[in-house]
Amino acid sequence: MKQTERRILLGRVVGAFGVKGELKLESWTEPRSAIFRYQPWIVRAPSGQESVINGVRGRDQGKNLIAVFPGVADRDTVEAMHGTEIYVARSALPPPKPDEYYWVDLEELQVETVEGVKLGTVSHLFSTGSNDVVVVRGDRERMIPFVFPDFVKSVDFEANLIVVDWDPDF
């Protein structure tokens, strides 16, 4: 992995499971167990220390996601890892399907209306269950449903631009 390659935060260690060095994870992938598909992991401890881990295995266990890190075999080691963030290189993710996007790829894109009015920059996205919402920060914050073709007309990564059909006063 190149040192300057973009990293994607996929989850974090939230606790220990049992006494044999298994970890409870919080995963932000969809489905949550997809986190195990993307490796190697770059893990960053709360202290800021980073390391690369290959060969992580895991499983769904009720409400929890359980992981086994190579070389971690006791609960004390796991307890010290609480809060550790899990990243992967952006290149570890498969290309999205046509007309699908990774949220992280949309962040920082400029947003303007079909009339050319600049609304701001994508701060982040969230899901409402029925659709995703793009949060745009400019002269003020706007929340625009990320729905094609009703509100979102185009996404152009080369131009760093999302064009929306949205009233700038709303």
Curated annotation (Swiss-Prot):
HAMAP family: Ribosome_mat_RimM. SUPFAM superfamilies: PRC-barrel domain, Translation proteins. Keywords: Chaperone, Cytoplasm, Ribosome biogenesis, rRNA processing. NCBIfam families: 16S_RimM. GO terms for cellular component: cytoplasm; ribosome. GO terms for molecular function: ribosome binding. This is Ribosome maturation factor RimM. Pfam families: PRC_RimM, RimM. InterPro entries: PRC_barrel-like_sf (IPR011033), PRC_RimM (IPR056792), RimM (IPR011961), RimM_N (IPR002676), RimM_N_sf (IPR036976), Transl_B-barrel_sf (IPR009000). GO terms for biological process: ribosomal small subunit biogenesis; rRNA processing. Transmembrane segments: none annotated. Residues 98-170 form the PRC barrel domain. The PRC barrel domain binds ribosomal protein uS19. It is found in: Cytoplasm. An accessory protein needed during the final step in the assembly of 30S ribosomal subunit, possibly for assembly of the head region. Essential for efficient processing of 16S rRNA. May be needed both before and after RbfA during the maturation of 16S rRNA. It has affinity for free ribosomal 30S subunits but not for 70S ribosomes.
